[in-house]
Amino acid sequence: MFEELRRYVKKIPRGKVATYGQVALAAGFPTGSRQAAWSLKTADPLLPWHRVIGKVNAKRGKILLRGANGVEQAQRLEAEGVIVNGIHIDLVRFGHVFKQRPT
């Protein structure tokens, strides 16, 4: 499960973000947003973990990490051109849409 989730995190392009729930759904685990978060905690540091954020609503996401990790996530996203307003990110502008899984 974790490897499949990480595979989808790798598909998020520079300058885009996806929510934990979107990653889980794309990987075939529609109720796996917590597992998606956990898979990032134990992942290779080269995985673009900073591109995965929490969901506020359909139009807005947010950085859930606190302290230095949250600051690092915001800095990495901003370096890729993502505008971070406090902890919030515009999903309409910066959200990645995964291709639908084959059935």
Question: Where are the regions that the model predicts?
Answer:
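Nucleic acid-binding interface residues in structured DNA/RNA-binding domains
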Residues: M1-T103
